[in-house]
Amino acid sequence: MQEKAGFRYQWKSEGVDVPLMHEKRTGHVSSMTKDQWQWDRLYAAAKAVQNGRKISEYVEAGGVAAAILAVSGRIYTGVCVDTCSTLGICAERNAIFNMITNGEQDIQKVLAIMPNGKTGAPCGACRELMVQLMPESYQHIEIMLDYKTERIMTLGELTPEWWI
């Protein structure tokens, strides 16, 4: 671990300096829960693939990055691909399709990092895909709304009445 601005950072092996969420508030890494450790891993994974760039005059990619924790414990990442038509894809759906490509379909946690570096909620299309993917249990998927303040909601709270 490294010291920077009073916080320890891990994930250096992945090329990303990520402040440990729990240590920012308590000053202690040893008291970090499994849940906090998972969110830190998701943040580091998303940050590692975030690389906003122009691919062509019609396509930009990587401004938003997402990481999904599958129920198995594996993490899947994706980046947004924006096009000048409707052919683009959000980072969250890209990560979900990566998960499906690798034989999994059950989501536990979702974290997306926006171009400004903050985390935020998935858009309606991404929420809809998660609901359709897990119609019996989507309500329990955890979404990191604000990594800095540790604000987390479930997809059920964000999408309380699907297809009334």
Region spans (language model):
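C-terminal binding/interaction regions
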Residues: 9-11, 15-55, 104-164
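Compact, glycine-rich, soluble single-domain proteins
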Residues: 79-93
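Short amphipathic alpha-helical face segments that pack within enzyme cores
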Residues: 90, 94, 125-128
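Hydrophobic "anchor" residues
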Residues: 74-75
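Short, solvent-exposed cationic patches
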Residues: 91-111
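Active-site segments that bind and position negatively charged phosphate/pyrophosphate groups
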Residues: 58-60, 81
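Extreme N-terminal basic, low-complexity initiation segments
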Residues: 2-7
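Short beta-strand scaffold segments in enzyme catalytic cores
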Residues: 60-70
